[in-house]
Amino acid sequence: MCGIFGIVAHHARVPAEVLERATRSLAHRGPDDSGTVILRDSAREADEIGLGNRRLAILDLSPQGHQPMNDPATGNWVVYNGEVYNFREVRTKLEQSGLYFRSNSDTEVILKAYGHWGERCLHEFRGMFAFALWDAQRHRVFVARDPMGIKPMYFYQSDRYFMFSSEVRTLLGTGLVPRVIDCSGLLNYLTFGSLYDPNTLVEGVSALRPGCYLIWEEGQVKQEQYWDLVGPILGEDCDPACAGAEKRGELETQVAEMLDESVRRQLVSDVPVGVFLSGGIDSSSLVDILSRNGTRPSTFSIVFREADYSEGEYSRAVAQHFRTDHHEIMVAQSDFFAAIHPAIHAMDLPTIDGINTYFVSEQTRAAGVKVVLSGLGGDEMFAGYSSFRTVPRMERFARAWDCMPKAVRSPLASMFRTLAPANDQNRKLIALSRNGGGIVHPYFLSRMLFTLEQQNQLLPAMETNSAAFLRAQKPLTESLSRALGLDPVNRVSYLEARCYMLNTLLRDSDFMSMAHGLEVRVPLIDHRLARRILALPGSWKLDSGTPKPLLVGALDGRLPEQIVHRRKRGFTLPFEHWLRDALRPMVEDNLRKIGDGVLRTLISERVVRSVWQDFLEGRTSWSRPWSLYVLQCWCQRHLSN
């Protein structure tokens, strides 16, 4: 796991001090080693390429794993962040083709694989990765991101420079990117409480989307998609595991085998591996698989004094059942208050989530662990959210509503707006009644933070009409178009994976864990496993009596009953309580300043005060004022001149 940066100077020279400063800014992602190199394009001597890397040593701890890494046979160079779990298998294939290796690292496998297969090397890799490679023979930069989007990659292009990095903050820190807020990104953030790829909050900076690669050549950037959850892309062969096994029992066995394989693959490491344990089905399944494979893992859990939020009872039960080396991390209001500013500083992009991961990552790394497994993705793949039931109902409502004559719809909608209590759920129902099957799909409405109407009030100076809203949500409509052919449950699964999981959970997990030099691995979303699960009938993933029946069936009764049938709580902090108590003065003071900074010409101070008052009086969720607090903090730190 690492942090990477690169800069291509087109008809110019790479500023060496910019390369060094940008690489240093990623030190938290890679505290073990650092390296930079400046290359001259042999064919176009007017162009230079600078590559930088900060390394967290997990595989091949020797100096042979140093980056940037060069392949003398081709002249290619690579910087790489992540892990290719099947690198030994890929290496064997390459050795059989006559290639020679100097190290035991997966970095060199990527370098040689690209030299041998070109961009088709991406279909050989199973893992989480973002890498950039200077192709010396074709005089181009090749940048790629893993199929599920576990590892981040951002890029920026001007007339003179093309830059890429693991973090947006690093690009801003070069001084070559204007500190201008991106209005589509702002709308996107206010809609969902995080930025949805390829949007960022910085004008001109974009995220490379999952399962995509990018080629920079002669000053031009071209992007291609090589993989997606819903089917083969660019000639990739279907996974043979997706054929046959039509009976449910056989499929549960197959899912169990693929889960087991994914967990075992992700244990590849030259340092100890721990587990984030919440006491839910997903993380407990990882502990079960590790135990059956003869491993006694170290497990780490957050517990709170507020019993309504704490999962300590369940995580302790799992730890005792499987006899793990268990560590509990007690988080009190005072701890949160002390850590709030460092945690927000760790945010590469603003988000309403992720601070829980900051706490557990800090303590896990302090215990001497460099790598952990997480159950992230289990809810998306195995239908663990309430959205798997509510969104199909909302879809049916939208279709029925659209079939009604307008003369009937209008008075009904007006009556509901007049009589319904003013709360978040009713605001979404009102938006759905106005929208029907129109610009906002019910899934996106279910995840929505501020509706279009609320954004109009919050951003009076901006063009927040339907057209602007659609432009900001364009990536989501593309995801929806891919999901429309799936059954209702699998459609929600695809959208949760490509929207909420990708842009909130995975991104937050990455920058909050890497703030402490900790690598988080996610076996439940191995890309082949995820595609296999998405291909199964949605009806098999919902059951009136058993949560996540497909996953529970695959585990064959090995989890404690109290874990299987417990009420779902989620890995969350007691924000509702804390914002009304210890955090209230700090948040109120910050929200009062929202008119003094970079947001002063965009956001209505009056509406911000109204949002805060609605929260205090119980008319809206904590997430709305908290999102504005985080936005103000982030913009003040990164976009203020």
Predicted segment positions?
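Short low-complexity, flexible loop/linker segments enriched in glycine and/or proline
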Residues: H341-H345, S387-T390, W578-R580
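Adenosyl-5′-phosphate
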Residues: M1-I7, A46, G173, D182, ...
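Cysteine-centered catalytic environments shared across enzyme families
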Residues: M1-D348, T357, S361, D556-G557, ...
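A structural signal for short hydrophobic/aromatic patches embedded in well-ordered alpha helices
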Residues: A22, Y189, L412, A530-I533, ...
